[in-house]
Amino acid sequence: MKPNISLINAVFRIACGLTIMSAASAKFTKKPWCRMHLFYIFMGAMKAGSGILRFCPVTYMFQHSDSGNNEHQNG
């Protein structure tokens, strides 16, 4: 698994992911019965994790789907 996002993009993802996680955690402590805050915590963790690993599965999928379409058009 090699990195497919830039360093600046990774730093931005880490910052946004940790911000989302901390805001959702604060809301979740006030309303633990609301499951939407738990969903936001997981989404923030996923965003921060993709920044730490510098690998985004969605970017990978789009890069490989574009290369497959070019082969069909050329061949």
Curated annotation (Swiss-Prot):
Organism phylogeny: Bacteria, Bacillati, Bacillota, Bacilli, Bacillales
Disulfide-linked positions: none
Organism: Bacillus subtilis (strain 168)
A cellular-component GO term for this protein: plasma membrane
Localization: Cell membrane
Positions of transmembrane segments: 7-26, 36-58
Keywords, sorted A to Z: Cell membrane, Membrane, Transmembrane, Transmembrane helix
Protein name: Uncharacterized membrane protein YezF
Membrane topology type: Multi-pass membrane protein
Pfam annotation, one family: YgaP-like_TM
Gene for this chain: yezF
InterPro entries to which the protein is assigned, alphabetical: YgaP-like_TM (IPR021309)
Coiled coil: none
